[in-house]
Amino acid sequence: MSNTIAVIGATRGTGLAAMRQLIDAGRPAAAVVRSVEKGRALFGDRASVVYGDVTRPETLTEAVDPDWAAIIFTVDITGGIGGRGMFAGRERIRAVMYGGLVNTVEACKQRGFQGRVVLLSTIGLTLPSTGMSILNWIKSGLRDHSLDKAEYLKKSGLDYCIVRAGILNDKTGGAHALSITARDWPLQMGYQIARADLARVLIACATEPTASRRELSVFWAETGHDSDEQLAAKLAALAA
């Protein structure tokens, strides 16, 4: 098995942040993208760029390398240029959010992938809140799609880690310690995290032995910064 970490959803949001951190750290990385041209424009020759569309299973079978150490799956319904349509119908949203993960898992099985799949999810899926109600309305059925894909991954037989993130923002990372717990939390403004900090957690969960077959919630705690050792210790505490 190689040390390569692949990111599916690598050209936007948290997936893009994860790719940049891997590249900046000099770690081998692969971006699975719908637009190879866009991927190469973003990453040049600093990372492997392979074509794969989560709504087209045959492309994932071609894309997945069984020697990858891990796959970080950050695919979501987004708006804007190149997005998949934030206000799309429920079936379209499910095809991307749930179907995309299912297609990825099945491609991994077909290819004999033995690494870990790290799934980005959200806090608040099991706890009622105004925030979740709004998000579930904007992205029709998000709650069910998210719960269903997590269950599918857990029952897949693959190694996994499911990371439930607080409300995302684009602030500079590294300015807060992180709260990492096994329990769910309501989707409220008091539980936020920068995409940069979340990307760091996703990368750690891809390789830390104690993150294997775990579900965790992560958001900012007090002002400060967790060293790599402190982050690893917080993940290890979940297994204690």
Language-model segments: residues:
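N-terminal Rossmann NAD(P)H-binding glycine-rich loop of SDR-like oxidoreductase domains
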Residues: 3-27
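Structural motif
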Residues: 4, 69-72, 116
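Conserved beta-strand positions in the Rossmann-like core of class I SAM-dependent methyltransferases
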Residues: 6, 30-31, 161
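NAD(P)H-binding glycine-rich loop region in Rossmannoid oxidoreductase-like domains
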Residues: 10, 31-111, 210
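Glycine-/Pro-rich loop/turn segments that contact NAD(P) or position catalytic residues
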Residues: 77-180
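Substrate-positioning beta->alpha
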Residues: 145, 163, 187-204, 214
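NAD(P)H-dependent oxidoreductase Rossmann-fold/reductase module
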Residues: 168-171, 176-186, 191, 226-240
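Core catalytic loop region at the nicotinamide-binding pocket of NAD(P)H-dependent oxidoreductases
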Residues: 205-231
